């Protein structure tokens, strides 16, 4: 009985790892990549975006080594950068601009300061200006506060 459960556990573990690897491969194949600061920024963008895009979180900071690795990894991708409209966000933007000089820089209104704090209709308009597809519900209900 223990051997069967042990085997089933490792089978599920291997399937789970395989699924993660396949999903990572699919994400690596995407042509568009967005770099953001935090997980809540990523979640906000994912809720508005209506097209496949890999979203990379820097967690507010990035080492020079990781930045160079990303530059090598993303050299043939369309890179978008959306960071907070605060001092740390602008510092990160400058760092990213050096490595990704052809990236499309997106900006939230300074009134919101943070990507995660901006309303979805505002994020939708920012993404739309960069020719990214968004869920139209966030454009249609702009006046109703969605």
Curated annotation (Swiss-Prot):
What biological process terms from GO does the record include? rRNA processing
UniProt-listed Gene3D superfamilies:
3.40.1360.10
Q: Which GO terms describe its molecular function?
A: ribonuclease M5 activity
Pfam families for the chain: Toprim
Domain (Toprim): residue spans on this chain? 31-119
Q: Which domain of life is it from?
A: Bacteria
Query: Which InterPro entries did the record assign?
Result: TOPRIM_dom, TOPRIM_RNase_M5-like
The name of this protein is Uncharacterized protein YusF
Gene field: yusF
